[in-house]
């Protein structure tokens, strides 16, 4: 079936039923509740007949009185319920009765994998249909709109998320092309245009994990903030947040959502930049302010949720600070407040997470200095992971050969080294000049010798 025919789902069945007075229901429930024909949207478990109520029993369990267990028969007898009070009745089940998976099972090919998942974003049902289901996309969408109570619009993703803004093209299969979605994640409301920004409801648990690590007095840098699932909830905990996203639509809805959630206002500064620019400039300048504040007692968190590319942005932390930047900062205060990085990435199931991570950062961590966490399955061959680690000062510094020494001492050594280097350069220049002069003299003497030998050969033999 490729065109939905709701009438095809009508079915008549024979059910065992009993008509009783309303005041008998509670007592009868005690012995018959496990036998009731369960209600599914349509009211067939019970039907009011004048002042009485008719109860229907599940035909898969009870077809006649003899199907009751002996204990149930005794309980019915004690309630004054006899066999004569039961009867068989024909009822009709229509399209509304059947569950979503039952309808899809009836209309889709039996020899192909079924529809396994879909996402709900406000009133939007989002599909990512496999190739073998494309021919059935419209009927699938229609059934979803019927059976998912909040559904008003059903869309299918038509391309991969491979553009710089992380959104994707989609096709409206059923309903109105209304993409302004409203969702509540835990205690926070978000609104956005789903066709222009990235939102994945399957990440709500991961958002919550990170937010639970953030406390009042902390600072969070959200490098790829999107519409704010990490940032806004962190700000509501009175954590100072710097939230950045390159996508102008994400930036727009990020600010909109800050206004929606009043508790977050005043705690977030927003940026509309490339992640590299944000790290090289805004992260750096704000880190220097934090490190310069001897009263700062919190933790610094950096969230990098761009799994397709986030690892490649780690290089922008390398050598971000030089000795001149840090000369006024106390070393012990600095080392107590190094940023904790939460970086997301994709990996094929047969790939080494260690190799992927270390290749991008090119730093030899000890095993206990970083941690991998599985986030979700993306496809049959790919998973999403998070690596969590504290960024070493030796990565953040340009010249880290003497990182263990106090900063003033290192600066002094650096200046001495520069002076010595100049001396060595001058000496090398002198040596080179002397060597060149010697080589020229040797060449000149050699040419003179050749000329003398040549002249002797030209003289006649006196003998």
Swiss-Prot record:
Cellular localization per UniProt: Mitochondrion matrix; Nucleus; Cytoplasm
Keywords associated with the record: Cytoplasm, Methyltransferase, Mitochondrion, Nucleus, S-adenosyl-L-methionine, Transferase, tRNA processing
Disulfide bonding pattern of the chain: none
Known EC number: 2.1.1.228
Any one GO molecular-function label of the UniProt entry: tRNA (guanine(37)-N1)-methyltransferase activity
Gene Ontology annotations of biological process type: mitochondrial tRNA methylation; tRNA N1-guanine methylation
One cellular component (GO) term of this entry: nucleus
Binding site for S-adenosyl-L-methionine: 207, 245-246, 274-275, 305
Keyword Mitochondrion annotated: yes
Catalytic reaction list: guanosine(37) in tRNA + S-adenosyl-L-methionine = N(1)-methylguanosine(37) in tRNA + S-adenosyl-L-homocysteine + H(+)
Main location: mitochondrion
Cited InterPro entries: MeTrfase_TRM5/TYW2 (IPR030382), SAM-dependent_MTases_sf (IPR029063), TRM5-TYW2-like_MTfase (IPR056743), TRM5/TYW2-like_N (IPR056744), tRNA_Gua_MeTrfase_euk (IPR025792)
Superkingdom of source: Eukaryota
Family: Belongs to the class I-like SAM-binding methyltransferase superfamily. TRM5/TYW2 family.
PANTHER family (UniProt xref): TRNA (GUANINE(37)-N1)-METHYLTRANSFERASE, TRNA METHYLTRANSFERASE
Its job: Specifically methylates the N1 position of guanosine-37 in various cytoplasmic and mitochondrial tRNAs. Methylation is not dependent on the nature of the nucleoside 5' of the target nucleoside. This is the first step in the biosynthesis of wybutosine (yW), a modified base adjacent to the anticodon of tRNAs and required for accurate decoding.
Quaternary data: Monomer.
Name of protein: tRNA (guanine(37)-N(1))-methyltransferase
């Amino acid at each position: 079936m490729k065109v939905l025919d709701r009438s095809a789902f009508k079915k008549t069945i024979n059910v065992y039923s009993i008509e009783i007075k309303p005041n008998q229901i509670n007592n009868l429930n005690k012995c018959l509740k496990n036998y009731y024909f369960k209600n599914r949207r349509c009211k067939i478990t019970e039907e009011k007949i004048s002042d009485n109520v008719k109860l229907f029993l599940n035909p898969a369990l009870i077809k006649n009185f003899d199907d009751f267990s002996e204990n149930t028969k005794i309980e019915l007898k004690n309630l004054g319920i006899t066999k004569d009070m039961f009867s068989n009745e024909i009822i009709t089940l229509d399209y509304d009765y059947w569950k979503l998976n039952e309808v899809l099972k009836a209309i889709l090919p039996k020899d192909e994998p079924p529809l396994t998942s879909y996402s709900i974003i406000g009133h939007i049902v989002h599909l990512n249909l496999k190739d073998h289901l494309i021919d059935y996309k419209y009927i699938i969408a229609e059934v979803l709109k019927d059976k998912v109570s909040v559904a008003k619009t059903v869309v299918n993703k038509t391309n991969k998320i491979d553009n710089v803004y992380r959104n994707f093209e989609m096709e409206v299969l059923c309903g109105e092309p209304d993409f302004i979605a409203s969702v509540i994640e835990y205690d926070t409301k978000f609104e956005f245009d789903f066709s222009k920004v990235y939102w994945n409801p399957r990440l709500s648990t991961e958002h919550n994990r990170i937010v639970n690590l953030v406390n009042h007095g902390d600072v969070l840098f959200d490098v790829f903030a999107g519409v704010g699932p990490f940032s806004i909830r962190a700000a509501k905990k009175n954590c100072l947040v710097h939230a950045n996203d390159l996508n102008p639509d994400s930036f727009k809805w990020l600010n909109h959502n800050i206004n929606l959630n009043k508790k977050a206002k005043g705690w977030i500064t927003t940026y509309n930049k490339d992640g590299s620019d944000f790290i090289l400039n805004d992260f750096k300048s704000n880190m220097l302010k934090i490190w310069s504040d001897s009263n700062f007692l919190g933790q610094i968190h950096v969230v990098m949720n761009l799994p397709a590319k986030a690892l490649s942005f780690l290089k922008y932390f390398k050598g971000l600070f030089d000795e001149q930047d840090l000369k006024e900062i106390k070393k012990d205060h600095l080392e107590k407040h190094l940023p904790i990085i939460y970086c997301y990435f994709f990996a094929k199931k047969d790939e080494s997470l260690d190799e992927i991570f270390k290749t991008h950062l090119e730093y030899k961590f000890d095993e206990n200095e970083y941690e991998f966490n599985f986030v979700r399955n993306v496809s049959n061959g790919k998973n999403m992971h998070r690596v969590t680690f504290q960024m070493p000062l030796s990565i953040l510094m340009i010249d880290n050969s003497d990182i263990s020494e106090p900063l003033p001492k290192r600066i002094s050594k650096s200046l001495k080294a520069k002076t010595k280097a100049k001396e060595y350069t001058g000496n090398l220049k002198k040596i080179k000049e002397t060597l060149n002069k010697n080589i020229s003299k040797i060449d000149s003497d050699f040419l003179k010798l050749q000329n003398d030998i040549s002249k002797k050969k030209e003289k006649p033999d006196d003998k």
